[in-house]
């Protein structure tokens, strides 16, 4: 009986201690000084035991601007969030340069001050102009070690408007 009461108490504690965090992020992506148009920008909530959770997603407009708002729930703490960008501006060579475009992933940790408790953001994290050709990723926790050992890379079909890289 005592074990059942203890188990139920622990389950209720995890539900009661669940915390919600909200954020608003905006900025402009540039690639070599030119607005990076039509690129996906996402905000994720960092999870320790499971895959990170998508909070919000947007695509840059004709001037490279994006604006993301969203909230996420964590079981025990105010959620830690980060901006995630597939950085095709900092192109990496690929075995199929005429058909594939590859680039490093970019993670930018949001300061705790810009993740408000509750479902509504209280302030905006303004990234201003982010020059992707020189941007570097920020990793949290054990991911720092993983990033040191192996770099995350994303690939996509080369857009028809983008010429293949010059032969080197």
Describe the residue ranges of each PLM region.
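Beta-strand-rich domain onsets/edges
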Residues: 2-35, 52, 135-168
């Amino acid at each position: 009986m005592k074990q059942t009461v203890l188990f139920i108490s622990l389950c209720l504690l995890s539900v009661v201690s669940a915390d919600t965090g909200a954020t608003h992020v905006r900025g402009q992506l540039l690639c070599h000084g030119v607005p990076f148009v039509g690129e996906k920008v996402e905000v994720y909530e960092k999870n320790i035991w499971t895959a990170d959770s998508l909070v919000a997603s947007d695509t840059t407009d004709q001037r490279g601007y994006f604006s993301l708002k969203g909230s996420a729930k964590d079981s025990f703490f105010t959620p830690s969030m980060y901006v995630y960008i597939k950085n095709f501006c900092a192109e990496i060579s690929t075995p199929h340069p005429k058909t594939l475009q590859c680039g490093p992933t970019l993670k930018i940790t949001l300061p705790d001050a810009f993740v408000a408790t509750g479902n509504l953001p209280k302030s905006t994290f303004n990234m201003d102009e982010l020059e992707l050709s020189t941007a570097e990723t920020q990793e949290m926790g054990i991911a720092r070690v993983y990033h040191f050992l192996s770099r995350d890379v994303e690939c996509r079909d080369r857009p028809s408007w983008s010429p293949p890289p010059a032969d080197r």
